[in-house]
């Protein structure tokens, strides 16, 4: 089903994109700016000290931003589905749990950014091709630039931490308007492979708290 939907998305995308009209009322920024959207994986606010009375202070930086007028700590975010692919199909496109729109007939957040004049990037620490990732990969490949750490020959056979995605930001031209997606591996199993040992500060190896702290 996912492969079939992805193939249809690819077939219809150019037509859907061509028909999309975006008319911003005014420029969002007075000078070239970069917007970064981070997509996590298997993280829960119920286990983060920034949002709850978690046993361990595993998100101290985020918690320190409470009360800072330049940040919004949003407490009531919910996913529309409990599995990665159907959730992201709805998060990244106009498809949602309230309409009957098919994934392959939808425009995406990447499309809107492009039509708004942004250079678009997608950097991922997720897998490039698999049964689960294919629809997400189709959306990612519509960006002007799309890269997967798993496809880097220099990193083959090694665990790539999400922090490695920061090196990709060096490829983004700060003199342009940019929209950048960073797709994390996050807390996806096995947790023990998701953080450097320097962040192993709570309880025992492999605990969820250590990934959130990283």
Predicted regions and their residues:
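Active-site-proximal alpha/beta segments of enzymes that process anionic O-linked groups
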Residues: 1-37, 42-203
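Active-site-proximal segments of metal-dependent phosphoesterases and phosphodiesterases across multiple
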Residues: 198-214
């Amino acid at each position: 089903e996912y492969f079939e939907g992805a193939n249809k998305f690819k077939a219809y995308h150019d037509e859907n994109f061509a028909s999309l009209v975006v008319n911003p009322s005014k420029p969002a920024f007075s000078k070239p700016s970069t917007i970064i959207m981070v997509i996590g994986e298997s993280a829960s606010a119920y286990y983060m000290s920034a949002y709850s009375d978690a046993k361990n202070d595993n998100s101290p930086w985020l918690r320190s931003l409470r009360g800072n007028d330049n940040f919004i700590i949003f407490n009531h975010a919910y996913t529309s589905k409990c599995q990665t692919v159907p959730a992201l199909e709805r998060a990244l496109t106009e498809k949602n749990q309230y309409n009957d729109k098919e994934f392959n007939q939808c425009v995406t957040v990447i499309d809107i950014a492009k039509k708004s004049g942004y250079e678009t990037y997608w950097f991922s620490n997720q897998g490039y091709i698999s049964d689960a990732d294919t629809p997400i990969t189709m959306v990612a490949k519509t960006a002007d630039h799309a890269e997967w750490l798993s496809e880097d020959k220099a990193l083959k056979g090694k665990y790539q931490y999400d922090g490695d995605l920061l090196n990709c930001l060096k490829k983004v031209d700060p003199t342009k308007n940019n929209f950048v997606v960073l797709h994390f591996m996050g807390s996806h199993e096995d947790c023990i492979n998701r953080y450097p040992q320097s962040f192993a500060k709570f309880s025992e190896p492999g605990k969820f708290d250590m990934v959130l702290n990283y």
